[in-house]
């Protein structure tokens, strides 16, 4: 048990100072020297690694995380830098770095808010359908997110020029919106934006669905998609002639949560509709096409409402049962540390198709050294033997490799011999001990500089001597060349003298 001083604090700093230097700390009182000498006999710094290894590794072969390892260490041992030492030990564990799989979390999505009619619309493509008499095969559906107003137009194909012409025709009727959200690849959206800029003068009005998150209930209703698919099968030759009637019938019948139709939401009034008998009776007992479409859409709405009600009741019952049996605990999502990798950093690379070999196969291979960075952002690596890998690796498939503090001294000379003869395209090389703190973000606090890990005066002198000897070898390549040429000249003179 370590005695406390007059102020009640432990003499850990004084004991460590006496243990390393053999002298008393300047703040040590004369009355405390005997207690510090006795306590220093019980302190053995070499046992710290043994304690960390025993607490980190389980008897079954499993490796604990930071919190569990720290709990086990603090239950039986104590020293001043126990938290930082545990973090450094866990992050530098070879088994944990290679065996731990990456957990990629989707970024937090913010729902898009729409406050005005015809400000933000979505565009969906449907088809291919049966070729109509006018050679139409596809259909484009434009839906206003605020009013749910729907416009449907036929298309001959799904090229960027054909879609742009259809969008321009809708612009001439209702005006251009602020944004158009489309679920297509970025290259195709770029082509549509170029076509719209040439035809109408708008720039970057169409955006990707991935860049903006919308509520699924605000997108194109599934009712109209289901109805349109069935209607095109029932009328394979003239389905494109009925698209204006389908969109109008949907806009005047589909009720919103506000109990208003999309037509009323769009124009702030209801359209003039003739009597139902006038709509249905045309030329005697024949029913008009619009009346058939209107009845079919109403039936489809009723079916969807019944399905939604039944599904909602089942979900509520399931949630109620789960709430009774379980207590939901809200957990904070894990945060990924963004890595800033540069030339000279030691990294682990992700194994290609590692999941096909079984879940017990390690995901990461290494360590490797970043030789240089290509113009496309790929990293060319060298393995531990100094051989360069054939293909560049994406930065997203790399993560920093953390070594123990004792391994960094011998590793620095290896890095110099491997990468000193190469002209870098990317950033200049860095010493091994210095780059670990710059790779990781500040919140992680797992990279520690060599000067912070080496606390004794002898270790600091060794570090300064090592940096003083290595830095000329890493930086001044011209000096090495001059020395080499001077040795060659002297050897040539000796050979001439002998001959």
Swiss-Prot record:
Domain (Integrase catalytic): give its ranges: 113-270
Example GO biological process: DNA integration
Q: Enumerate the GO terms in the molecular function aspect.
A: nucleic acid binding
Q: Which Pfam families match?
A: Integrase_H2C2, rve
Q: Record's InterPro entries?
A: Integrase_cat-core, Integrase_H2C2, Retrovirus_Pol_polyprotein, RNaseH-like_sf, RNaseH_sf
Protein name according to UniProt: Gypsy retrotransposon integrase-like protein 1
The organism that produces this protein has a lineage beginning with:
Eukaryota, Metazoa, Chordata, Craniata, Vertebrata
